């Protein structure tokens, strides 16, 4: 008897908690972090530069400049690569993964591949499911004018249902990014993205974003994809992580995976089911 009574109570309580996540995210992103504008207390140190400190800074400027320049070239190599010595950076786009039964997003250069069309458009859609009270949709488009750079847009619409109060909450998350694949091999590619994250509804705020992503073409017709994007909106983290496996069939695929969104303090976890096509 007690068990039969507790189960409905726990179900209603869990549904209410999930429905409060979106509202909590909205409230936090609207208000942001409190800014400490008070003057320093007498016991707090105040940063002041003495003349000797200024002279030491001037003396060390030359050494510091050397390390800054050195760090710049290291960063340039790590992020962009060496086009004089890394042949894979010239690998052309494939028409779609596994078009020849073995190649992923990029194929090795030969006399025929150089002449092939480089333009490609990737479109995919995924249903997001956490429970009966929390679900959503993730639409992603990737425009590849050539093998060097691409433009990517992600649109997530999240829904939460409060069965106790019979109300619904929704949140629209947009990510706009410029992408670059640093490593471009037949079976593996790794790259980064730079762009902006925007949350609509009654928040209407945006922030700078950066991310990493990779594709592994493990064996015939199957690949694995992972992507992470970090951003801040109104001083609070708005991050996304996704991992999914894809089964490819000609120029389309079916997928299953997992997504996590961290927006403010709430964290959202979803199983994903979807499909995509390459044009």
Predicted features along the sequence, with ranges:
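Outer-membrane beta-barrel proteins
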Residues: 80-84, 105-111, 145-147, 179-184, ...
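Short, conserved, surface-exposed binding loops centered on an aromatic residue
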Residues: 184-185, 202-204, 214-218
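Short, surface-exposed coil-to-beta transition loops
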Residues: 135-136, 209, 238-240
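Eukaryote-specific, low-hydrophobicity, charge-rich regions
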Residues: 92-176, 185, 189
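Short helix-loop boundary/capping segments
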Residues: 208-226
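Repeated loop/turn-to-beta-strand initiation elements of outer-membrane beta-barrel proteins
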Residues: 147-153, 185-190, 220-226, 247-256
């Amino acid at each position: 008897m007690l068990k039969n009574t507790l189960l409905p109570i726990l179900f209603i309580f869990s549904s209410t908690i999930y429905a409060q996540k979106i509202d909590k995210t909205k409230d936090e992103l609207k208000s942001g972090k409190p800014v400490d504008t008070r003057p320093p207390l007498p016991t707090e140190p105040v940063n002041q530069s003495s003349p000797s400190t200024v002279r030491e800074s001037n003396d060390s400027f030359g050494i510091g400049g050397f390390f800054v320049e050195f760090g710049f070239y290291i960063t340039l190599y790590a992020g962009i690569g060496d086009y004089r010595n890394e042949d894979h950076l010239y690998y052309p786009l494939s028409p779609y993964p596994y078009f020849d039964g073995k190649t992923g997003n990029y194929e090795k250069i030969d006399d025929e591949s150089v002449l092939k069309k480089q333009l490609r458009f990737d479109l995919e859609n995924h249903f997001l499911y956490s429970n009966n009270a929390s679900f959503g949709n993730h639409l992603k488009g990737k425009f590849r004018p050539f093998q060097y750079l691409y433009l990517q847009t992600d649109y997530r619409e999240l829904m939460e249902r409060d069965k106790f109060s019979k109300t619904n909450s929704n949140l629209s998350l947009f990510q706009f990014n410029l992408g670059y694949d640093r490593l471009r091999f037949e079976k593996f590619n790794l790259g980064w993205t730079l762009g902006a994250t925007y949350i609509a509804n009654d928040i209407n705020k945006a922030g700078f974003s950066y991310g990493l992503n990779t594709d592994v073409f493990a064996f015939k017709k199957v690949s694995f994809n992972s992507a992470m994007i970090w951003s801040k909106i109104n001083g609070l983290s708005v991050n996304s992580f996704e991992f999914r496996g894809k089964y490819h069939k000609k120029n389309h695929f079916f997928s299953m995976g997992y997504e996590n969104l961290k927006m403010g303090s709430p964290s959202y976890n979803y199983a994903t089911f979807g499909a995509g096509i390459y044009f």
